[in-house]
Amino acid sequence: MGRSISVSFGLLVVFLSLSGIGADFDCPSGWSAYDQHCYQAVDEPKSWADAEKFCTEQANGGHLVSIDSKKEANFVAELVSQNIKETRRTDFVWIGLRAEDKRQHCSSEWSDGSSINYQNWIEAESKKCLGLEKQTRYRKWVNLNCGQPYRFTCEI
């Protein structure tokens, strides 16, 4: 009877591991997991377009981070705070959102194509790309000049 229970328990563990239930989400080395996604704070300043390109080249499905909830915003803020070195250029960090038309209206979707379900603007300006501001502990979104080099966070 005891051996039968051990075999049954072993099969249950294998089944749960294969189905992904109860297993940790597996991210590439150097990436952090949160809610079935992987994130990487990149401490190398780039323009918005170059940062987006860098993220797409890191992994299949990679893009600048899209923030869908306050919980995810808090996770990203902590990740950035812990992984971006303090310099004069750490006032802002790119996220995957920018204005797509001449009237400076923001796109209705993130750079990864997902819908905007959560917003946390600090102010509206005429610049086209969005980032997180250090002064708000990387929790508020601010409009920035797309060509300026800032650090950024990728998501897959």
Swiss-Prot record:
GO molecular-function term, one example from the UniProt record: toxin activity
Keywords: Disulfide bond, Hemostasis impairing toxin, Secreted, Signal, Toxin
Keyword DNA repair assigned: no
Signal peptide: 1-23
Gene3D superfamilies: Mannose-Binding Protein A, subunit A (3.10.100.10)
SMART domains: CLECT
Location of this chain's protein in the cell: Secreted
Annotated C-type lectin domain residues: 34-155
Note: Shows greater sequence similarity to the alpha than beta subunits compared to other heterodimer snaclecs.
Function field: Interferes with one step of hemostasis (modulation of platelet aggregation, or coagulation cascade, for example).
Subunit structure comment from the entry: Heterodimer; disulfide-linked.
Protein name: Snaclec A10
Organism for this UniProt entry: Macrovipera lebetinus
